[in-house]
Amino acid sequence: MAESHLLQWLLLLLPTLCGPGTAAWTTSSLACAQGPEFWCQSLEQALQCRALGHCLQEVWGHVGADDLCQECEDIVHILNKMAKEAIFQDTMRKFLEQECNVLPLKLLMPQCNQVLDDYFPLVIDYFQNQTDSNGICMHLGLCKSRQPEPEQEPGMSDPLPKPLRDPLPDPLLDKLVLPVLPGALQARPGPHTQDLSEQQFPIPLPYCWLCRALIKRIQAMIPKGALAVAVAQVCRVVPLVAGGICQCLAERYSVILLDTLLGRMLPQLVCRLVLRCSMDDSAGPRSPTGEWLPRDSECHLCMSVTTQAGNSSEQAIPQAMLQACVGSWLDREKCKQFVEQHTPQLLTLVPRGWDAHTTCQALGVCGTMSSPLQCIHSPDL
């Protein structure tokens, strides 16, 4: 994908800092306490145990800590700079207006557009000026804390390995991306606050649900894998032993960074910031199944077509993909156009034996659903 096309997706990044990501930080403290032998078995385990820097320096290759920190901060700065391009606000605004127009409850359309008018400029300005690259990279274990560690008393043993000291807050909001809430937004309620004791409506208007739903829709549209490939071009100082691993690692931890930005910053925060919403995600109506994704979206089309093709011989793949377009719920014309457009790439991807979602993710039409840590772009790894 050309960089000019990637730019428009990068410009969607900052307002989605609080989107629901897919990185699951579930490795237990007991497992991580096993030490480097466990941490460095895979990139995902190194990340979950906050030992990525250790594994890169001591186990997987020879690289200085300062180099790793600079690489990580470079990636964050690149993403941040690209997100501030002139077309950013126009691209985001048009996308959100389109989402307002396809809300399942038409009564919400005027309120949705009013929320955009009132709060869109505030949110954009805030996130463009508050990203803390060092905090994000420190969370990944690629940068050291700028504050000296407290000295340990003689005779006292540390029960946990270094990467597990100082457990991270959950969410990370206060220390990473939102170090200080802006006074103007913190002090005054917005015109669309959820406080119904002060404003009486014929029905309770679910602005907080609306806010979260819009953020989730934006986050789902960002092709993290494609962005990581572009950002990997900054890889220049990781002299690992096997050829190609440098670029692969850059792609991998670019996706990790994106997941940190998109996944660990909960949608409740932005909506609380501008609408005084509760941090309780159970409040208000739930998003409809599939978050009102159209049934014939490219991701759905791709997964249906790929599933059908995966059950066929290599010679029969083209016919099998067209046969999938006769499915009862698919838009036949859109499906055929999709097959015609992507047949060359799918003929290469389908025989690799990946599941349908991984194949469509590699094609760039589905977002990351499971682990983002597979380096699918380098067949040698």
Curated annotation (Swiss-Prot):
Disease link: Pulmonary surfactant metabolism dysfunction 1: A rare lung disorder due to impaired surfactant homeostasis. It is characterized by alveolar filling with floccular material that stains positive using the periodic acid-Schiff method and is derived from surfactant phospholipids and protein components. Excessive lipoproteins accumulation in the alveoli results in severe respiratory distress.
InterPro entries named in the record: SAP_A (IPR003119), SapB_1 (IPR007856), SapB_2 (IPR008138), Saposin (IPR008373), Saposin-like (IPR011001), SaposinB_dom (IPR008139), Sphingo_Act-Surfact_Prot (IPR051428)
Physiological role: Pulmonary surfactant-associated proteins promote alveolar stability by lowering the surface tension at the air-liquid interface in the peripheral air spaces. SP-B increases the collapse pressure of palmitic acid to nearly 70 millinewtons per meter.
Gene Ontology biological process terms, A to Z: animal organ morphogenesis; respiratory gaseous exchange by respiratory system; sphingolipid metabolic process
Keyword terms of this UniProt record: Disease variant, Disulfide bond, Gaseous exchange, Glycoprotein, Repeat, Secreted, Signal, Surface film
Protein name in the entry: Pulmonary surfactant-associated protein B
Species of the source: Homo sapiens (Human)
Subcellular location(s) per record: Secreted, Extracellular space, Surface film
The Saposin B-type domain, residue ranges: 65-147, 204-281, 295-370
Lineage, uppermost ranks: Eukaryota, Metazoa, Chordata, Craniata, Vertebrata
Disulfide bond entries: 69-143, 72-137, 100-112, 208-277, 211-271, 235-246, 299-366, 302-360, 325-335
Record bears the keyword Repeat: yes
Primary residence: secreted
Miscellaneous notes: Pulmonary surfactant consists of 90% lipid and 10% protein. There are 4 surfactant-associated proteins: 2 collagenous, carbohydrate-binding glycoproteins (SP-A and SP-D) and 2 small hydrophobic proteins (SP-B and SP-C).
